Regions:
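Short, charged helix-capping/linker segments at alpha-helix termini
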Residues: 3-6, 22-30, 41-60, 191, ...
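Structural recognition of an alpha-helix C-terminal capping motif at a helix-to-coil junction
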Residues: 56-63, 77-89
């Protein structure tokens, strides 16, 4: 059985479990948790970088699945993508709450947020190359620019929220993001035009 076929069967099983969960089947939710929680937990842990918080948020995700399984729409994406979207949203909410509570932001390694969800070994290799290239591009940024961009694009904070978290004027945050994005565009241009393989 090919990896692609195996993944398709897996997604079909998860979709069936979500449907049964929507009908109130607790055993289906338990099975869904057993099958998918390692991926969900892994994504949340990458965002929060705190095992205990990631465990709590993972449980929150499956509580949300129990309550909202009927909202899953197969036409809008795979069951795995839906679960990861819920996980990412919950993790970002927790990150924002923690950053607001502590009034600061922990060190950020934006490149670590490029989780691999490749279907084939070729896609995995391509993803690794892309992550390496993005890491190199991020290295051209100042620490301040990298931090502001990570908060905006990976953690979903608004520019006002970033200014508040970093205790900086809004204009400074906007400048850091704008200049950082210009540098990133220049650094990523060879990759986008296919000059880098």
């Amino acid at each position: 059985m090919s990896l692609e076929t195996s993944r398709l069967i897996q997604e079909q099983e998860w979709g069936h479990l979500i449907t049964r969960t929507a009908q109130g089947d607790q055993a289906a939710l338990a099975t869904l948790y057993d099958r998918t929680s390692p991926q969900v937990f892994g994504l949340i842990l990458k965002i929060l970088n705190n095992r205990e918080a990631a465990e709590e948020v993972t449980l929150d995700v499956y509580t949300q699945v129990w309550r909202q399984a009927n909202t899953y729409d197969r036409t809008r994406g795979t069951p795995g993508a839906w679960l990861m979207m819920l996980a990412r949203a919950r993790a970002i909410d927790r990150f924002r709450a923690g950053a607001a509570e502590h009034g600061r932001v922990e060190s950020l390694d934006a490149a670590q947020l490029f989780a691999s969800d490749a279907d084939t070994p070729e896609q995995e290799v391509e993803g690794q190359e892309r992550r390496k290239f993005v890491q190199q591009a991020l290295a051209v940024l100042t620490v301040e620019q990298r931090q502001a961009i990570a908060l905006a694009y990976f953690y979903g904070l608004s520019q006002s929220e970033i200014a508040e978290q970093l205790q900086l004027p809004l204009g400074t945050v906007k400048t850091r993001i704008r200049l950082g994005m210009i540098k990133l565009r220049e650094a990523l241009a060879p990759y986008e035009t296919g000059l880098v393989s």
